[in-house]
């Protein structure tokens, strides 16, 4: 039985050759961990590319994302896995840097868009600056799931994810994963089972009257 703490240590990403060598050994740690995680999440091992799944598990390990405590969700798309994170996981990682001061969000009913403004402490702690991201409803296919019933909430979550990526605070090894709300839009239907996280509102402290600072000044 593979223990949960096996998924937690931060490690470097393996090269494709290294991963193939380890996967060839059925008793290797990555082989056991991958099979255990997929089994726990109800994913059919015969219907998945296990080599690609192992790469996703290593990505989770390298970024301290534990799929067993809902820090990351594994979505089956055909015979491949796609890792997605909750917006709360992204936000918590950014706050842990102690550089994210606050988040302000707004919705423009005319443009049907949501904007997120992050207030960030500069690396040298000499001042504050802002990062902005705006997303438009017209950019997303909204004919399904919560995009149909809660479009404003979904737009705000997506704009927050965009702003956090732009901020450079997340520091993921490899590509920053998508959030659940981004994966819901569109026509693609995940094959087999989809581990669905609970949907919750993001409530963050608002920051007002903070002077915008150009980072290039430092």
Swiss-Prot record:
InterPro entries (UniProt xref): Phage_lambda_Bet (IPR010183), RecT_fam (IPR018330)
GO molecular function, one term: DNA binding
Biological process, per Gene Ontology: DNA recombination
Name by which UniProt lists this protein: Uncharacterized protein UU154
Organism of origin: Ureaplasma parvum serovar 3 (strain ATCC 700970)
């Amino acid at each position: 039985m593979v223990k949960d703490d096996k998924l937690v240590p931060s490690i470097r990403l393996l090269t494709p050759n290294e991963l193939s060598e380890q996967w060839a050994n059925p008793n290797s740690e990555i082989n056991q961990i991958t099979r255990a995680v997929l089994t726990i999440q109800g994913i059919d091992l015969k219907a998945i590319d296990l080599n690609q799944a192992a790469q996703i598990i290593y990505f989770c390990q390298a970024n301290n994302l534990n799929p067993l405590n809902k820090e990351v969700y594994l979505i089956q798309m055909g015979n491949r896995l796609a890792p997605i994170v909750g917006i709360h996981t992204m936000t918590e990682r950014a706050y842990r840097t102690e550089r994210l001061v606050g988040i302000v969000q707004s919705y423009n009913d005319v443009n049907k868009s949501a904007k997120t403004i992050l207030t960030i402490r500069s690396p040298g702690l000499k001042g504050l600056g802002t990062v902005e991201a705006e997303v438009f409803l017209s950019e997303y296919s909204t004919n399904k799931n919560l995009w149909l019933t809660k479009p404003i909430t979904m737009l705000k979550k997506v704009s927050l994810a965009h702003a956090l990526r732009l901020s450079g605070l997340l520091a993921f090894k490899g590509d920053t994963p998508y959030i659940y709300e981004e994966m819901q839009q569109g026509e693609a239907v995940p094959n087999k089972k989809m581990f669905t996280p609970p949907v919750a509102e993001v409530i963050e402290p608002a920051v007002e009257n903070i002077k915008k600072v150009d980072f290039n000044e430092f």
